[in-house]
């Protein structure tokens, strides 16, 4: 995707915020527990390479990604010796590519290990489906057979075993406890404990630090975002959001009563009012459902009017502004703030989706 460096729309990523979130989490972990930075989906929209560098500087001991291509991008960017785990499914024909690049893969089916052609040792992490219902083995028999396969094949190393909690971001813990118990049953069925046992995502690491095992997978909260609104007041430390989204007014004009804007003419002025056109739209991740939400101009709220277009959006101004005036879509402006949580609430989604939607057409600028 082409990045729009010649357009006045940009994302600022505060590296100091990422470092602070990591340090605060590390301070509550036992020294024996590693923190792995989850940088999948372009680091949740924050930029995979720069976030990985920042996380490593802050003390992260490795990285988790969703697909092999993300792991290879890290290797190509200079992370040659760092631990990298692919959490999602990888094609069998790509196993050798992962092995040659010392990338750990998730295994969740016995048949995946059959007839692999490897030129180097492949490190695998056994995924246990303890109740999430996506990927993973579900019985002790499966776990023992996969362990036996890896033991008998000198080119396979059962490096880790893990699970993922479905309700760690909820205050009610009964289902979480059921999952943990099932995982522990499968873990104890193995003859040898793998090097890495890991279960905790951001929510679990924040609320259930006792189940850190050997490593935690620190994702959404590394970026300063709360795993869910339900647990926001129960966090052990304040999270610092790292992402802000800005643009500038490229056209300012006054509407007369009866004038309409954007596709479908869904918004019509009832009085004289000032509006501005912003060079950002749903092709950038500012989806059409943002219509009716608001931005900040000079610290004041300005509603998004009419339909969000592919490349442009129109806002109603509280008064006349100069062309080129800065607009805050996510972030702080003169003491007021619009957060990813605010946008998520309006869009009826979660903060993860808000930032992940912001694609690479918007340039990232890294500060601090």
From Swiss-Prot:
InterPro entries from the UniProt entry: Ala_racemase (IPR000821), Ala_racemase/Decarboxylase_C (IPR009006), Ala_racemase_C (IPR011079), Ala_racemase_N (IPR001608), Ala_racemase_pyridoxalP-BS (IPR020622), PLP-binding_barrel (IPR029066)
Tagged with keyword Isomerase: yes
A Pfam family the protein falls into: Ala_racemase_N
Broad class of enzyme this protein falls into: isomerase
Keywords: Isomerase, Pyridoxal phosphate
NCBIfam families per the UniProt record, alphabetical: alr (TIGR00492)
Protein's recorded name: Alanine racemase
Species assigned in the record: Listeria monocytogenes serovar 1/2a (strain ATCC BAA-679 / EGD-e)
């Amino acid at each position: 995707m082409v990045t729009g460096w010649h357009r006045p729309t940009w994302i600022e990523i505060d590296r100091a915020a990422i470092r602070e979130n990591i340090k605060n989490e590390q301070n509550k972990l036992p020294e024996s527990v590693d923190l792995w930075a989850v940088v999948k989906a372009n680091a949740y929209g924050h930029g995979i390479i720069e976030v990985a560098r920042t996380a490593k500087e802050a003390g992260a001991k490795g990285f988790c990604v969703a697909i092999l291509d993300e792991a290879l991008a890290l290797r190509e960017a200079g992370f040659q010796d760092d631990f990298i785990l692919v959490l999602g499914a990888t094609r069998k024909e790509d196993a050798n590519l992962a092995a040659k690049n010392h990338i750990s893969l998730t295994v969740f089916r016995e048949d995946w290990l059959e007839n692999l052609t490897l030129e180097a040792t492949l490190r695998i992490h056994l995924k246990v489906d303890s109740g999430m219902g996506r990927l993973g083995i579900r019985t002790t028999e499966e776990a023992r057979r996969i362990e036996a396969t890896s033991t008998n094949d000198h080119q396979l190393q059962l490096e880790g075993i893990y699970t993922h909690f479905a309700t760690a971001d909820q205050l009610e813990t009964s289902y979480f406890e059921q999952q943990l118990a099932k995982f522990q049953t499968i873990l104890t069925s193995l003859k040898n404990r793998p090097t890495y046992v890991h279960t905790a995502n951001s929510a679990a690491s924040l609320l259930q630090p006792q189940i850190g095992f050997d490593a935690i997978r620190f994702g959404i909260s590394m970026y300063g975002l709360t795993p869910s609104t339900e647990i926001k007041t129960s966090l052990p430390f304040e999270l610092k959001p790292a992402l802000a989204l800005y643009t500038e007014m490229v056209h300012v004009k006054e509407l007369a009563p009866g004038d309409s804007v954007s596709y479908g003419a869904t918004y019509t002025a009832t009085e004289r009012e000032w509006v501005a056109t912003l060079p950002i739209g749903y092709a950038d991740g500012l989806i059409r459902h943002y219509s009716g939400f608001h931005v900040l101009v000079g610290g004041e709220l300005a509603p998004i009017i009419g339909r969000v277009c592919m490349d442009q959006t129109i806002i109603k101004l509280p008064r006349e502004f100069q062309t080129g005036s800065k607009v805050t879509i996510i972030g702080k402006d003169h003491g007021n703030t619009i957060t990813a949580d605010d946008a998520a609430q309006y869009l009826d989604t979660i903060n993860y989706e808000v930032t992940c939607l912001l694609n690479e057409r918007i340039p990232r600028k890294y500060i601090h």
